[in-house]
């Protein structure tokens, strides 16, 4: 037994200078752990609700109410429970909140407690977090989906697509994939400089040049890959996070690259891109409630490319179940703060994998030095992780943790590589 004895919380800052919640847990055997909660810039309508203070302090974004929720309600609800009984702990958290969207105590308060308990239990068990959560077979290192060019809500430019990513699919190890990604990142900076484009950074460490559109951005990245001596499509593939909900409105549809488009027109554009570039993944290509559009797009190109539901599914097993029944998307983006507890996150991943959906573990644009998602990516065998460019310490912290995990696993480690993606699975 490893009984939860004390629970504490504080307000800290995330990578964008906004407040977030950090929770600490002490067990009766002396084991101690803390967890910090991320937050997003582009958030889905169906996400669990963060508790923010409002008012003038921190522009209304303070989290003193969430901290107080941890201290006054969450702590009494979980103190005395065995920390290794994660499902019991998380159910106690859900019962204490009592709302379907976690809006009373706040998903940020609940998640901080949930993750801190898991970390403390791992410490008490003498196991790394990935091993504690994932069991004896956790051994697959994810492909890093590096967001090296930022647009949309992550940058103050005219580029509508939110993230342009590189995926080092041809590497033999995670260590090699990280090096390849970093080399492409630095090569892209030199390409941008040569063309007189800005090299300032967006929220997630990627460059934020004001380029003409999607194809120009993909072309710039393709040139950067070639500049490193790596082979586009074989060594390094491309991926997008469109975040289409950000430019969709009822009545006018998708306002994209200067014109209003229908779901069918957006789908035709994606089909054209997938044929022209080695794109392995497109996240949120359509609005979070455009189920008909998603189903049609999945039928059209789902056998060629990974179609990832982020705002569509919000890591919620009920939303995912609906998507599976309808045949919408073929992959789930996993963000722990969208759903609010570790148990619900693991349930969503399990549901996805049992139904043939791929999963991609993900950070948020407002991150901290917390490395939990690196361990979770290995624990659940997701095969993919999205945690920004190889720049800014809150992003690099996750990559460095994966290096440690790969080293820890030794000969047992396996890098997911190209088989993580439907494009290659369908090609055989």
Curated annotation (Swiss-Prot):
Endpoints of the signal sequence: none
Cellular location(s): Cytoplasm; Secreted; Cell surface
Pathway: Carbohydrate degradation; glycolysis; pyruvate from D-glyceraldehyde 3-phosphate: step 4/5
Keyword Membrane: no
Cofactor binding annotation: Binds a second Mg(2+) ion via substrate during catalysis.
PANTHER family cross-referenced by the UniProt entry: ENOLASE (PTHR11902:SF1)
UniProt name for this protein: Enolase
